[in-house]
């Protein structure tokens, strides 16, 4: 048979090797505490900044979910917060006592500012964290900048810190504390538990580090050091 060029590409249907999923970067509890302390000591918008950070670490929300929260979700000293996630799916996330306290304190100041704005003819904002920008609420980019400022003030490497690393820290610390994957999946709003399972690998790596650092038999003997 005479050889000719094929009209189609026979390899187009062949799938290439999949990329290995990178483990999410996270923070330890000491680093999270430093970030929270830095927010509490903010020179401007201290109550708002404290509320943002406490809610983020207490719930593991995505940054867009956090900054766009409606103020109605925060009324009545809630023990659970209704969050609207990807695809408009709603979920309830529990609030820790520090997060509830930070939220209550912030609402007092926020409502006072809103009352003053209304007296000047401005409409009330439906958002928990209002802004004069086009969206009407604090942008994710502004919060990204804020969290970097908290990192610098708290002595944590800014390269390690993003709103998403706080979400990772929330999940990893819960898992280390004994929470089950299904509960963490629900709180994070993951559609598939396989997405949540990656945190078990993060925890495995952290446990290995702790063993190598603290276990007496993991340290080199005197003869090995010589």
PLM features: residue spans?
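Conserved catalytic core of the tyrosine transesterase superfamily
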Residues: 1-226
């Amino acid at each position: 048979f005479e050889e000719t060029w094929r009209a189609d590409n026979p390899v187009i249907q062949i799938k290439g090797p999949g990329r290995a999923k990178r483990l999410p970067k996270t923070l330890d509890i000491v680093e999270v505490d430093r970030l929270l302390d830095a927010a509490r000591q903010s020179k401007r918008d201290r109550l708002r900044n404290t509320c943002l950070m406490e809610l983020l670490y207490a719930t593991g929300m995505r940054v867009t979910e956090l900054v766009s929260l409606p103020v109605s979700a925060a009324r009545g000293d809630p023990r659970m917060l209704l969050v609207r996630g990807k695809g408009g799916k709603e979920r309830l996330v529990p609030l820790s006592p520090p997060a509830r306290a930070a939220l209550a304190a912030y609402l007092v100041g926020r409502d006072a500012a809103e009352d003053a704005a209304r007296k000047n003819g401005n409409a009330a904002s439906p958002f928990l964290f209002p802004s004069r920008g086009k969206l009407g609420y604090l942008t994710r980019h502004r919060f990204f900048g804020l969290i970097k400022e908290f990192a610098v003030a708290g002595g944590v490497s800014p390269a390690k810190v993003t709103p998403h690393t706080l979400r990772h820290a929330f999940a990893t610390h819960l898992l280390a504390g004994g929470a089950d994957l299904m509960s963490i999946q629900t709180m994070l709003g993951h559609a598939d538990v396989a997405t949540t399972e990656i945190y078990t690998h993060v925890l495995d790596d952290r446990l290995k580090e702790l063993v190598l650092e603290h276990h007496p038999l993991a340290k080199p003997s005197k003869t090995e050091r010589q």
